């Protein structure tokens, strides 16, 4: 019979870094509230949570890299919103942020949960930040908890 390794949804004793972009802050702050709610509900001590605010989504990957390099965190949660406008700026920012965050996770070995919304409209972002479509900040924190515990089980 194979051994199955799964992460549990228990944040007790885990340390989390959260990075949130200030651009579109009305969305970012709701995502942050959702992430903090998930962490605390699942046993995280607020003393083991550090939040870094960056100017916008484009700065998230570098801040994630700096956090991961400290070795202080069991998982990092990235939050923000990139909303499509009339120019191709959205395409460049959304692609680079997602690639940058993925590279940090792969290069550092630290679990990084991607909670940066990439939406076509403000309404879609609002829906994903705590209304119709749930709160992706909450979901990202759940991913961070589970993955951090999974990694502890892989020896």
Swiss-Prot record:
The active site is at 89 (proton donor). The keyword Zinc does not apply. The keyword Transferase applies. It holds the Pfam family DMRL_synthase. It comes from Geotalea daltonii (strain DSM 22248 / JCM 15807 / FRC-32) (Geobacter daltonii). One of its GO terms (cellular component) is riboflavin synthase complex. (2S)-2-hydroxy-3-oxobutyl phosphate binds at residues 86-87, 128. GO terms for molecular function: 6,7-dimethyl-8-ribityllumazine synthase activity. This is 6,7-dimethyl-8-ribityllumazine synthase. InterPro entries: LS, LS/RS, LS/RS_sf. Its EC number is 2.5.1.78. 5-amino-6-(D-ribitylamino)uracil binds at residues 23, 57-59, 81-83, 114.
């Amino acid at each position: 019979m194979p051994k199955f390794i799964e992460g549990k949804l228990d944040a007790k004793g885990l340390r989390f870094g959260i990075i949130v972009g200030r651009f579109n802050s009305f969305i970012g702050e709701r995502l942050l509230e959702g992430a903090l709610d998930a962490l605390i509900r699942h046993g995280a001590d607020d003393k083991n949570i550090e939040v870094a605010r960056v100017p916008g989504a484009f700065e998230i990957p570098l801040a994630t890299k700096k956090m991961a390099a400290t070795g202080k965190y069991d998982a990092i949660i990235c939050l923000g919103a990139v909303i499509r406008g009339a120019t191709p700026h959205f395409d460049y920012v959304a692609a680079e942020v997602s690639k940058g965050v993925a590279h940090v996770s792969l290069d550092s070995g630290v679990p990084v949960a991607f909670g940066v919304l990439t939406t076509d409209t403000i309404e879609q972002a609002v829906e994903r930040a705590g209304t119709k479509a749930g709160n992706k900040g909450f979901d990202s924190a759940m991913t961070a908890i589970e993955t951090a515990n999974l990694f502890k089980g892989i020896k």
